[in-house]
């Protein structure tokens, strides 16, 4: 199939990378907001190795809490959906970005499987990866703007026993 696909998490990671390259303190919301006008593409040319790094993941989780950052990303995501249709993957895609979409799926996996997958992806410290995943989930559930939640309309799919291709 040749279906357009957008990984919204990579957008936050790419913006996080941009902030870090400009030596922006990601814990300072106003400083992060100043960089937003420079982020005009959904995916700048950044290697996946960099985007998938622990540092970028941690900082992306922090900046994704900021309302103006989310507003900008959601606007780009909705534009993508309107222009291209297709599959959009992300933590608040079915509850906030495209709540009216008729096809909603909620993929999840057991914690140890998520840690194992992440470990295989970045070859980092197992314990640190587990803590990072827990902290990110907590931040995403507790953020004020578009918190992570399960849409009762989505079809839940446990991906614990599935491989990446499946």
Regions found by a protein language model. Give the residues of each.
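Phosphate-binding beta-loop-alpha motif at adenosine-nucleotide cofactor sites
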Residues: 102, 148-165
């Amino acid at each position: 199939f040749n279906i357009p696909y957008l990984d919204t998490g990579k957008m936050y990671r790419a913006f996080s990378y941009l902030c870090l390259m400009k030596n922006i303190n990601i814990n300072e919301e106003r400083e992060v907001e100043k960089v937003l006008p420079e982020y005009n593409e959904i995916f700048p040319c950044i290697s996946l190795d960099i985007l998938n790094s622990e540092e970028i993941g941690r900082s992306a989780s922090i900046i994704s809490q900021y309302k103006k950052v989310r507003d900008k990303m959601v606007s780009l995501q909705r534009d993508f959906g309107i222009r291209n249709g297709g599959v959009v993957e992300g933590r608040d895609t079915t509850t906030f970005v495209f709540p009216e979409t008729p096809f909603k799926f909620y993929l999840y996996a057991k914690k140890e499987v998520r840690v194992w997958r992440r470990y295989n992806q970045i070859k980092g410290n197992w314990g640190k990866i587990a803590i990072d995943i827990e902290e990110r989930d907590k931040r995403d559930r507790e953020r004020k703007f578009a918190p992570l939640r399960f849409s009762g309309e989505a079809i839940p799919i446990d991906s614990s026993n599935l491989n990446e291709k499946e």
